């Protein structure tokens, strides 16, 4: 399978960040954002150049926190920007992969929706993604936890229907279909932190989701020592 991979999409939070939540500094090995991004650069440099990598920011990454977010600023790590096969995009972003339209969004607004909508939870992120598609807006609640920049145009509106909707943020790998749209939450590579436990997040880390762009069939590789829970919604 690995030999057939042509694209890698990273939906934000490349790093843990600095000062994101109380006492975070006690958990960090790399204490600066530059050190953390250098680790990312070193890891991504192991990916062959024929594979294109798309990187968007999340709320733990450096740069503007308010949505929509510009790409991670070059001043924090110029090496990522200078790689021929790396494309730094904003949050949200719409990209085309061999004619397949992919809408990428880190997913900060999931926090607001889970808190205000009965029946939705962090454990089932694709249900929240359906809510966003129905609303035709990626951050439909204003004035809550998610900061939204006062732009002249609302760039969070979903104008075009994507083929694939890719979200992150909640550290839960999960997939589903909704009206012909493939919904993917790409999960995380980090085990549960004390902060995540305090807000009710239960990650299933170490799961790589791989999409066949011709058939839309999804494969997964589990790099976690724990048995894989069902990531397919009914």
Regions found by a protein language model. Name each.
Residues 1-234:
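Extended recognition/assembly regions associated with phosphoester-bond processing machinery
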């Amino acid at each position: 399978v690995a030999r057939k991979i042509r694209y890698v999409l990273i939906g934000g939070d490349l790093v843990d960040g600095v000062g994101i939540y109380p006492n975070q500094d006690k958990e960090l090995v790399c204490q600066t954002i530059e050190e953390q991004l250098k680790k990312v650069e070193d890891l991504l440099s192991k990916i062959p150049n024929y594979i294109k990598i798309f990187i968007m920011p999340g709320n733990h990454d450096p740069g503007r926190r308010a949505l929509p977010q510009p790409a991670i600023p070059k001043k924090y790590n110029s090496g990522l920007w200078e790689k021929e096969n790396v494309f730094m995009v904003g949050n949200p972003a719409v990209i085309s992969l061999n004619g397949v339209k992919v809408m990428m969004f880190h997913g900060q607004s999931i926090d607001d929706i889970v808190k205000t909508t009965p029946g939705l939870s962090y454990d089932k992120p694709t249900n929240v993604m359906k809510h966003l598609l129905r609303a035709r807006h990626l951050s439909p609640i204003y004035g809550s936890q998610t900061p939204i920049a006062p732009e002249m145009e609302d760039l969070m509106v979903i104008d075009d229907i994507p083929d694939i909707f890719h979200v992150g943020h909640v550290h839960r790998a999960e997939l589903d279909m909704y009206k012909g749209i493939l919904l993917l939450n790409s999960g995380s590579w980090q085990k549960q932190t004390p902060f995540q436990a305090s807000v009710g997040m239960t990650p299933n880390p170490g799961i790589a989701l791989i999409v066949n762009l011709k058939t839309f069939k999804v494969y997964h590789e589990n790099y976690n020592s724990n048995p894989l829970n069902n990531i397919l919604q009914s």
